[in-house]
Amino acid sequence: MKGQVMIEFIKTPIRKLLNLHLRWVCKREFRKQSFSRFNERPVELAFVFKHIARIYPRKVLDVGTGATALPHLMRNCGCLVTSIDNIEDYWPSEMVNRHYHVINDDITNSKLQDKFDLITCVSVLEHIEDSESAIRNMFTLLNTGGYLILTFPYTENKYCKNVYKLPGSSYGQNNPYITQSYSRNELSQWLEENNGIIIKQTYWQFWDGDFWTVGNQIIPPFEVGVEDKHQISCLLIQKK
C-alpha cells in the first residue's frame, strides 16, 4: 500500500509537467496559425465518416497516419483502432503523433498479424511507389467482407507518375516524395488481383487543369461524374 502511494506521489508531478508541456505546444500551434491554402481533407474525411456511420466497424486500421488525428477521431466513435506509418524510412526526423500511438510499419511489407473490419488509407497511397504491394497487404489484413477506404489523386483515363512534374503544377516541386494520379486501369488491376469490388466511388474537381495541382484551384470543389473533369476520387471497396 505504501509502495502504491509512493508511486502516485512520484507520478503526479511528472504528469503535471508533461501536461504543462502539451498545453504549451497546443498554445504555440494556435498562435502560429497562418493560412496557406485549402486542401482535400474536408471531402476525404466526410467520405470516411459517412461510411463508418453505415458500416460501424469494430476493428479499424489507419495506414499512413503521419501526424494526423484521424485514428483518435475514429477511436472516439468506439472503434478499436490501430495506426501505422513508415516512420523511420519515410519521415526524415522520425515523426511523432501527439494524438495517437502510431506503430512503425511499412504497408508494402507489413509485419502486422491482426485482421480488420475496415482499413482507411487517406491521401497516402499516391506517395508509395510500390502501390501494388501496399494494396495487396491491405487486402491481406482485411477480414473477408471487410472494407477498404481509399482516397487519392485520380484521373479516369490516364495515369501520371508524379503530378508535381507536370507543366502548370501549382506546388510540390521541392517535395522529397512523388504524388501519383491513378486511373481506371490501375484500379481495375488491384480489384482483380485482390478479389475486391467497388461499393461506392465519388469524383471531385479541385482544379481547372487535367491533373491534381495543375491550373487554378477550385474552392469549394465540385462533386462531379466520371465523365467530367476530376482530380480526386474517394472509394469504398469490399473484400469478397
Can you say where each PLM-predicted feature lies in the sequence?
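Residue-level marker of regulatory loop/turn positions in helix-turn-helix DNA-binding domains and
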Residues: 40, 63, 113, 226-229
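Membrane-embedded glycan transfer/ligation machinery
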Residues: 42, 68, 231
